[in-house]
């Protein structure tokens, strides 16, 4: 996978993850072009399309488009399943995810994506183990943020 984008029906980019080094200028150009192409397509059209030297796989969930660019030899159906699995993980974590969850908790959305995909390849297919890793990270963060007494800070309590 080259990159993954999440954007709204209004063309607002909500999340982007790039797995291949690309300049900012080129990224912006690619995002703009791809959003125009995907948003112009009718709902009944195929979720796969040829774009530049890549294949694009996208799926709309509510008001968000989840869009992945893959190499020519990669499987479109597996990529569609990866998108669906990511949405399932977001749903499990947020409880019926919506665009506002992504906007206000974008760091969690990126963290979930990073637990699921690494370098554009699937890291873990098990929803349970990905969610368990996220829960553990949340617990660590809560421990770090919880107030401690001076004695606890010094390791004396």
Swiss-Prot record:
Main location: Golgi
Presence of the UniProt keyword Protein transport in the record: yes
GO cellular component: AP-1 adaptor complex; clathrin-coated pit; intracellular membrane-bounded organelle
Lineage top rank: taxon: Eukaryota
A Pfam family per the record: Clat_adaptor_s
Single GO molecular function: clathrin adaptor activity
Subcellular location: Golgi apparatus; Cytoplasmic vesicle membrane; Membrane, Clathrin-coated pit
Keyword Plastid: no
CDD domains membership: AP1_sigma
Protein's membrane topology: Peripheral membrane protein
Gene Ontology annotations of biological process type: intracellular protein transport; vesicle-mediated transport
Sequence positions bearing Phosphoserine: 146
Biological function: Subunit of clathrin-associated adaptor protein complex 1 that plays a role in protein sorting in the late-Golgi/trans-Golgi network (TGN) and/or endosomes. The AP complexes mediate both the recruitment of clathrin to membranes and the recognition of sorting signals within the cytosolic tails of transmembrane cargo molecules.
Subunit structure: Adaptor protein complex 1 (AP-1) is a heterotetramer composed of two large adaptins (gamma-type subunit AP1G1 and beta-type subunit AP1B1), a medium adaptin (mu-type subunit AP1M1 or AP1M2) and a small adaptin (sigma-type subunit AP1S1 or AP1S2 or AP1S3).
Entry's family note: Belongs to the adaptor complexes small subunit family.
Protein name (Swiss-Prot/TrEMBL): AP-1 complex subunit sigma-1A
Gene designation per UniProt: AP1S1
